[in-house]
A protein has these predicted regions:
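N-terminal hydrophobic signal-anchor/signal peptide
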Residues: 1-76, 97, 243-245, 270
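A hydrophobic, helix-centered structural microdomain
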Residues: 54-140, 249, 254-270
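Short Ser/Thr-interspersed hydrophobic loop/turn segments at strand-loop and sheet-helix junctions
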Residues: 88, 223-224
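Flexible acidic/glycine-rich loop/turn elements at helix↔coil and beta-strand↔loop transitions
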Residues: 93, 229-231
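A short, structured surface patch at a secondary-structure boundary
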Residues: 137-138, 150-213, 256-263
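A short, polar/charged loop-to-alpha-helix boundary motif
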Residues: 140-148
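Long, intrinsically disordered, low-complexity Ser/Thr/Pro-rich regulatory/activation regions
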Residues: 212-221
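Acyl/amide activation-and-transfer machinery of modular secondary-metabolite enzymes
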Residues: 233-241
Length: 270
């Protein structure tokens, strides 16, 4: 980080936690805009408050149209691969082809006057939705439905599942989530409610990610491997905040292009 000068934060804005209704002024370490971001290395950073991450105003209709068109084209192009993946999952292990899971989505309340006093089911920071994936684990991977953080060389992952996860093919059904309006192609990855609540308690700025629609891929995903520790999550949150700073359709296209080698060369991670 030599040559990087600290950037002063001009003001602090009080931010009330949606989870507990308490007033606080959390800060987050994020990459300095314009600094080179490299996987496996901490980015050049500055300290800023949550208010600095308000997403840029963009035409919702243009953004929605862009995502629908791209998702539709990708769905058509990827349909042969998805068909082969479905057959492989079905023949290789007992259980359904698709894995449906609840995730925390966009929080539409953050910019409304009464948002701070509203509470959702399970006190989540966004609207829950069902995410679609090709099943990559055994059907008994989670005891009693309790969320278990996936780890490297997880023995719950099937042989076919290892390939699907490494190539990110297991995420392709989420193109349907994009068409439904649950997700965008690019954005912060959505998390399960129980894990979201835990991370929100340990990383003060974590709920800020919900101010934009979650995505299939993102800056954090093309820059980092699978997260296995809390520090890994903090690092990905920093990249998510940087994405929110420079969010644009051109930035989305750039991340989409960077996702291609991630899939083909099996680098980076979700």
């Amino acid at each position: 980080m030599s040559g990087i000068q600290p950037i002063p934060v001009p003001r602090d804005v009080l931010w009330r936690s949606q989870s507990a209704g308490r007033r606080s002024t959390p800060s987050v370490t994020v990459p300095v805009p314009g600094a080179e971001l490299r996987a496996g290395q901490p980015p050049a950073v500055m300290v800023a408050t949550s208010s600095d991450f308000e997403p840029r105003l963009r035409s919702e209709r243009v953004t929605r149209l862009f995502n629908v068109v791209v998702a539709s084209c990708m769905l058509v192009a990827a349909s042969p691969i998805m068909l082969l993946a479905a057959i492989a999952v079905r023949l290789s292990s007992r259980g359904p082809v698709f894995y449906l899971q609840e995730r925390v989505g966009l929080d539409r309340r953050w910019n409304r006057t009464r948002a701070i006093n509203e509470r959702r089911r399970e006190d989540l920071g966004g609207a829950p939705f069902t995410i679609y994936k090709f099943r990559s684990m055994r059907v008994d991977a989670e005891v009693n439905g309790q969320a278990v953080w996936a780890k490297k060389d997880d023995d719950r992952v099937t042989r076919v599942g290892k390939f699907l996860r490494a190539s990110r093919i297991d995420e392709l059904p989420q193109l349907l989530n994009v068409l439904r309006g649950d997700m965008n192609i690019v954005g912060p990855r959505p998390e399960r409610p129980s894990i979201f609540v835990r991370l929100r308690e340990q990383i003060a700025e974590y709920p800020v990610r919900q101010r934009v629609r979650p995505g299939i891929t993102g800056l954090a995903q093309v820059s980092n491997p699978y997260d296995q520790t809390l520090d890994d999550v903090r690092r990905k949150v920093a990249f998510d905040m940087e994405y929110m700073r420079r969010q644009s359709l051109l930035e989305d296209l750039r991340i989409m292009l960077k996702t291609v080698p991630v899939m083909l060369l099996r680098i980076g991670g979700w």
